[in-house]
C-alpha cells in the first residue's frame, strides 16, 4: 500500500513491519458530537531512511499517519515493549 504524507511517499511493501500490537484512536464527529474511535488492524512500519508510519483501517478505508521517532517510541513502549527494545535498546531493570 502506498501513502503520501508530508510530501513523502511511504510504500509499506518496501518498509519493515515493526509492530501489529498497537492501538490508535482518532476523533470524528456525528451530528455535532465529537467521538473517539479506534482504528482497526493498526501497524507500525519503519523505512530504510528511518521514517516511521502508522497505518490503520476505518470501515472500508486504509489510513496512515507519519510518526516522528519519538512518537514511534511512545507507541512501542506502551503497546509492544519487545519491538521497542529491538529498535531502541533494552530498558534498564528496576
Task: Label each residue range with its predicted role.
Residues 1-94:
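Secondary-structure transition motif
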